[in-house]
């Protein structure tokens, strides 16, 4: 199922061109949208389009989160598809990571894969690994695309399961996820590793220099960029969502988002050569 520029090539080209690792998250939480946007017939589309257009000069990738669209039912799904269409039509060089966190049986996973990779043709998805390899095989059939397995997430309670250790192997759950991925030599697979665990991030990067990491938790969740850049390596996407698109909730929201993205971009550029 080839014929398109694969995720890895798209990501590397964009990252090296901008000398940056910035992934702009799109989490259009309706309650936090500017009032001027809330009055729009399609507020999620308007908000995301304006954020995208204001930040496109600095974004290595975009990561729309499906939950903020699904809450509006069929209207939300239509708006999600329009946002994806806007990105693909106007910024085809920028990869799209659909943050959907799917994880289900083989026959169900096949339908998800067909929708996101076959129909929408987003470049990448976030998936849960906890139902095992058969839950991701349908996605791997789309070889030009990439999946990000949830590995060590940035939320405060992630340690309740992800840092539990298996007595028979000595590995934690998140380490087991990495071990299985490497054991079966899946090439078009990356890991979600939270910025809120810099020590574990550094170890995982040392052990997996060629895997692409999606790193949430920077900005609104408290992680500092200066702590991330020395340890994350170039094969990383450092995501900022609320810190960029909710920099203002006034009529200047898009301008402020662009300014915030530019500021992060410049900080990343100063460190990029040394990564």
From Swiss-Prot:
Transmembrane segments: none annotated. The gene is pyrF. This is Orotidine 5'-phosphate decarboxylase. It comes from the Bacteria. PANTHER family: OROTIDINE 5'-PHOSPHATE DECARBOXYLASE (PTHR43375:SF1). The keyword Amino-acid biosynthesis does not apply. The active site is at 101 (proton donor). One of its GO terms (molecular function) is orotidine-5'-phosphate decarboxylase activity. Gene3D superfamilies: Aldolase class I. Belongs to the OMP decarboxylase family. Type 2 subfamily. InterPro entries: Aldolase_TIM, OMPdecase_type-2, OMPdeCOase_dom, RibuloseP-bd_barrel. One of its GO terms (biological process) is 'de novo' pyrimidine nucleobase biosynthetic process.
């Amino acid at each position: 199922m080839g014929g398109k520029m694969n995720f890895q090539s798209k990501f590397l080209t964009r990252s090296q061109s901008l000398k940056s690792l910035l992934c702009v998250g799109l989490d259009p939480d309706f309650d936090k949208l500017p009032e001027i946007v809330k009055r729009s017939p399609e507020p999620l589309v308007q908000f995301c389009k304006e954020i995208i257009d204001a930040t496109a000069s600095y974004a290595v990738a975009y990561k729309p989160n499906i939950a903020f669209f699904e809450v509006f039912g069929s209207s939300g799904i239509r708006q999600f598809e329009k946002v994806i269409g806007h990105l693909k039509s106007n910024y085809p060089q920028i990869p799209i990571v659909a943050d959907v966190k799917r994880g289900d049986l083989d026959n169900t996973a096949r339908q998800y894969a067909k929708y996101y990779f076959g129909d929408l043709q987003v470049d990448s998805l976030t998936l849960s690994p906890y139902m095992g390899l058969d839950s991701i095989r349908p996605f791997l059939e789309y070889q030009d695309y990439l999946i990000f397995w949830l590995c060590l997430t940035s939320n405060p309670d992630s340690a309740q399961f992800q840092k539990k250790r298996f007595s028979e192997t000595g590995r934690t759950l998140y380490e087991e996820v990495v071990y299985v991925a490497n054991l079966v030599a899946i090439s078009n697979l990356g890991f979600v590793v939270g910025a809120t665990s810099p020590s574990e991030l550094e170890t995982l990067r040392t052990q997996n220099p060629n895997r692409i990491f999606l790193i949430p938790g920077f900005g609104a969740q408290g992680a500092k960029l200066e702590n991330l850049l020395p340890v994350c390596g170039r094969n990383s996407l450092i995501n900022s969502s609320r810190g960029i698109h909710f920099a203002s909730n006034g009529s200047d929201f898009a301008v402020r988002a662009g300014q915030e993205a530019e500021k992060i971009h410049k900080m990343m550029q100063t460190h990029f050569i040394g990564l």
